Amino acid sequence: MRRSIARLCLGVVALVWMAFPISAHHSGAMFEPVKTITVKGVVKLFEYTNPHSWLWVTVTNDDKTTTDWGFEAEGPSTLFRAGIRKSDLPPGEKVTVTGRPMKDGRPAAAWVSLVKEDGTVLNPRPQ
Protein backbone atom coordinates (compact mmCIF):
# COMPACT_ATOMS: atom_id res chain seq x y z
CA MET A 1 0.00 0.00 0.00
CA ARG A 2 2.79 2.43 0.90
CA ARG A 3 4.57 1.68 -2.38
CA SER A 4 1.38 2.44 -4.30
CA ILE A 5 0.96 5.78 -2.56
CA ALA A 6 4.64 6.62 -3.04
CA ARG A 7 4.41 5.80 -6.77
CA LEU A 8 1.23 7.83 -7.11
CA CYS A 9 2.82 10.82 -5.38
CA LEU A 10 5.94 10.51 -7.51
CA GLY A 11 3.79 10.34 -10.63
CA VAL A 12 1.82 13.44 -9.65
CA VAL A 13 5.00 15.37 -8.88
CA ALA A 14 6.48 14.32 -12.25
CA LEU A 15 3.35 15.42 -14.12
CA VAL A 16 3.24 18.78 -12.36
CA TRP A 17 6.94 19.34 -13.00
CA MET A 18 6.57 18.51 -16.71
CA ALA A 19 3.69 20.97 -16.98
CA PHE A 20 6.01 23.91 -16.26
CA PRO A 21 7.44 25.45 -19.41
CA ILE A 22 11.12 24.75 -19.65
CA SER A 23 13.12 27.04 -21.87
CA ALA A 24 16.79 27.69 -22.31
CA HIS A 25 17.87 31.06 -21.07
CA HIS A 26 21.18 32.77 -20.74
CA SER A 27 22.56 35.76 -18.92
CA GLY A 28 23.56 39.03 -20.50
CA ALA A 29 27.18 38.47 -19.46
CA MET A 30 28.35 38.37 -23.07
CA PHE A 31 27.36 42.03 -23.54
CA GLU A 32 29.28 45.06 -22.30
CA PRO A 33 27.54 46.24 -19.12
CA VAL A 34 27.93 49.99 -19.72
CA LYS A 35 29.52 50.66 -23.12
CA THR A 36 27.16 51.30 -26.04
CA ILE A 37 27.49 51.41 -29.82
CA THR A 38 25.23 53.03 -32.39
CA VAL A 39 24.89 51.85 -35.98
CA LYS A 40 22.85 53.07 -38.94
CA GLY A 41 21.55 50.57 -41.43
CA VAL A 42 18.64 48.80 -43.04
CA VAL A 43 16.49 46.12 -41.40
CA LYS A 44 17.29 42.73 -42.90
CA LEU A 45 15.10 40.57 -40.65
CA PHE A 46 13.13 40.92 -37.42
CA GLU A 47 12.86 37.56 -35.65
CA TYR A 48 9.94 38.15 -33.26
CA THR A 49 10.51 34.93 -31.30
CA ASN A 50 10.85 33.42 -27.83
CA PRO A 51 12.80 33.41 -25.64
CA HIS A 52 14.55 36.38 -27.29
CA SER A 53 13.82 38.35 -30.42
CA TRP A 54 16.59 39.30 -32.83
CA LEU A 55 16.74 42.33 -35.10
CA TRP A 56 19.18 41.95 -37.99
CA VAL A 57 20.44 45.20 -39.51
CA THR A 58 22.68 45.46 -42.58
CA VAL A 59 25.23 48.24 -42.09
CA THR A 60 27.32 49.70 -44.92
CA ASN A 61 30.90 50.20 -43.76
CA ASP A 62 33.23 53.04 -44.77
CA ASP A 63 34.89 50.78 -47.37
CA LYS A 64 31.43 50.05 -48.92
CA THR A 65 31.36 46.46 -47.63
CA THR A 66 28.38 45.45 -45.51
CA THR A 67 28.11 43.84 -42.09
CA ASP A 68 24.99 42.24 -40.66
CA TRP A 69 24.54 43.29 -37.03
CA GLY A 70 22.34 41.26 -34.68
CA PHE A 71 20.50 43.02 -31.85
CA GLU A 72 19.06 40.79 -29.14
CA ALA A 73 15.83 41.91 -27.49
CA GLU A 74 13.16 40.51 -25.23
CA GLY A 75 10.54 38.05 -26.42
CA PRO A 76 7.33 39.07 -28.22
CA SER A 77 5.21 39.48 -25.08
CA THR A 78 7.62 42.03 -23.59
CA LEU A 79 8.07 43.80 -26.93
CA PHE A 80 4.29 43.92 -27.32
CA ARG A 81 3.95 45.58 -23.89
CA ALA A 82 6.61 48.08 -25.03
CA GLY A 83 4.45 48.85 -28.08
CA ILE A 84 6.65 47.04 -30.61
CA ARG A 85 5.04 44.78 -33.20
CA LYS A 86 6.76 42.61 -35.80
CA SER A 87 5.21 44.80 -38.50
CA ASP A 88 6.98 47.89 -37.09
CA LEU A 89 10.33 46.82 -38.55
CA PRO A 90 9.87 45.41 -42.05
CA PRO A 91 12.86 44.51 -44.25
CA GLY A 92 14.26 47.63 -45.89
CA GLU A 93 13.32 50.00 -43.03
CA LYS A 94 16.15 52.49 -42.35
CA VAL A 95 17.06 52.53 -38.65
CA THR A 96 19.62 53.78 -36.16
CA VAL A 97 20.13 51.25 -33.38
CA THR A 98 21.94 51.66 -30.07
CA GLY A 99 23.01 48.62 -28.10
CA ARG A 100 25.45 47.14 -25.61
CA PRO A 101 28.02 45.35 -27.80
CA MET A 102 29.34 41.83 -27.43
CA LYS A 103 32.51 41.66 -25.34
CA ASP A 104 34.25 39.48 -27.93
CA GLY A 105 33.85 42.02 -30.74
CA ARG A 106 31.34 40.13 -32.88
CA PRO A 107 28.81 42.38 -34.68
CA ALA A 108 26.00 41.86 -32.19
CA ALA A 109 24.60 43.75 -29.23
CA ALA A 110 21.78 43.90 -26.71
CA TRP A 111 19.17 46.25 -28.18
CA VAL A 112 18.84 49.40 -26.05
CA SER A 113 17.06 51.85 -28.37
CA LEU A 114 16.10 52.29 -32.01
CA VAL A 115 15.13 55.32 -34.07
CA LYS A 116 13.27 54.84 -37.34
CA GLU A 117 13.81 57.15 -40.31
CA ASP A 118 10.55 58.99 -39.48
CA GLY A 119 11.84 59.74 -35.95
CA THR A 120 9.81 57.07 -34.14
CA VAL A 121 11.74 55.75 -31.14
CA LEU A 122 11.37 52.08 -30.16
CA ASN A 123 12.66 50.94 -26.78
CA PRO A 124 12.42 47.17 -26.25
CA ARG A 125 11.60 47.38 -22.55
CA PRO A 126 8.27 48.75 -21.30
CA GLN A 127 8.66 52.04 -19.47
Protein language model regions, located:
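Conserved hydrophobic positions within beta-strands
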Residues: 39-43
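A short macromolecule-binding patch
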Residues: 62-74
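OB-fold/S1-family single-stranded nucleic acid-binding modules
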Residues: 102-125
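Short nucleic-acid-contacting surface segments enriched for D/E, G, S/T with interspersed K/R
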Residues: 80-97
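Short aromatic-glycine-enriched beta-strand elements
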Residues: 49-60
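Bacterial N-terminal signal peptides
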Residues: 9-21
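Short boundary/loop segments of OB/S1/cold-shock single-stranded nucleic-acid-binding domains
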Residues: 22-37
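Short, structured beta-strand/loop micro-motifs enriched in basic residues and often containing a Trp
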Residues: 73-81
